[in-house]
Amino acid sequence: DSLGRLVNNNASESHISLKINSNILRYNFSSSMKLIKTETNRYIKAPTALYIPPREMFSLFDGFISLYEKREVSFDETYLDLAKALNAAPLKGQAYERSIELIQPLLDKWNIQVVKKNNRFYIIEEGKEYEAHLVAEGLRKMATMLYLVINGELKENSILFWDEPEANLNPSLISVVAELLVNLAKNGIQIFICT
């Protein structure tokens, strides 16, 4: 019920020390405190972490953020986080060029682009444009990865948690996904896969 209840009943104060990337944050508080005091006044920037759930989000994106924030829905908050990450516009200039380098192994094997128009995603494959909900789920998962890279949400020092990347994926694309993940890891993205 209160911050002070975190303090052991026999102790007068609690001390917490947190080390992130060789930066240390220290906190002290007593059983009567309502606010925490920090011993240091530094902000430590945590790496961006993205979780991609087993069910794809691409075809659900249009209106999902508003729906989630205003109504009871049977999706957990990780879907909202992913929708917000997908909501960012693509990078431009050198940042965009750098993002393309991260996904180049995939683009070399598969002529695909992902665009967002009027809050809907479209997948352009071999010059033909398809609405996201009209293509196979495995293709939507790949398009999600591509878009997260080109909009800068998945970048160096990011952490990616991908649950069942192989689910509903065309078997011929599994090696392409593996190459993409290896290339992302080589470029400083930490990857956790659950299958």
Stretches found by the model and what they are:
Residues 176-181:
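Conserved hydrophobic alpha-helix in the ABC-type ATPase nucleotide-binding domain
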Residues 159-161:
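Walker B motif beta-strand of ABC-family P-loop ATPases
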Residues 163-165:
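Walker B catalytic acidic pair
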Residues 194-195:
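H-loop/switch region of ABC-family ATPase nucleotide-binding domains
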Residues 1-157:
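Phosphate-coordinating catalytic segments in nucleotide- and nucleic-acid-processing enzymes
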Residues 185-186:
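Conserved ATPase "switch" residues in P-loop NTPase domains
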